[in-house]
Amino acid sequence: MSKRLLGAIRSFGDPGTYVQVLRLLHYYGYSHVQERRKLTLGTGSTIAPNISFANAERITIGADTKVGERAFLWAGASTGRITIGDHCRLGPEVFVTASDYGLMPDETIAHQTRNERDVVIGDDVWLGTRVFVGAGVEIGAGCVVSAGSVVTRSLAPGSIAAGSPARVVRRREDYAVLAERPDEPEAVPSVSAAHES
C-alpha cells in the first residue's frame, strides 16, 4: 500500500476528523450563516467565519476587503445600510452599526425609538481591532482608525484618527499618491518611492 493510502486510512480512524465534521455541522446552525448568504460580497474579499451579521441584505462589502475575527456588522432593521469599499481591512472585533436609539424623556429604555442611518466606509480604509463605528458615519477613502477608537462623526479622506470619541491626529501624506494609482499592480509606486520624489 502507498503512504498516501495509509495516511487516508489513519485519518478516517482519527477522532479529530469527526470532531471537525461536528464543528461544521454546529457552525451551520448559527444564525449568521444564513445572514451571510444575503450580503453582497465583492471579488477577492474574505470574512472570518465567526462574524455577527444583522440584516445582511443591507450590507455591501467591496472587492479585496478583509474582515477580521468576531466582527459585528449590524445594518438597520428597515433602512440603515452598511457599505464598505474596496481594499479595506477591518480588524478583529470591529463593530459597525447602522442604527442606534434615542433618549426620549417620557419613554422607558426598552421603548426608545430606533434611529437608522447609513454607514459608508470608503475604499482603502483600515479599522484597527475593536473600533466602533456608529450610525450615520461616513469614513472617507484612505482613512486609518486606531485600535479601540469610537467613531461617532464622519472622517475626511486620508485621515488618521484615534480615541474615544475618535479625533483626527494627522493625515496620510502619501494618500494623494496612492489614490491616483492605476489599476495595474506593476505600475503602483511604493510608498517609499513616493516620499523620495
Indicate where each model-derived feature is located.
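Terminal amphipathic alpha-helical/low-complexity segments used for targeting or macromolecular assembly
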Residues: 1-37, 43-44, 87, 100-104, ...
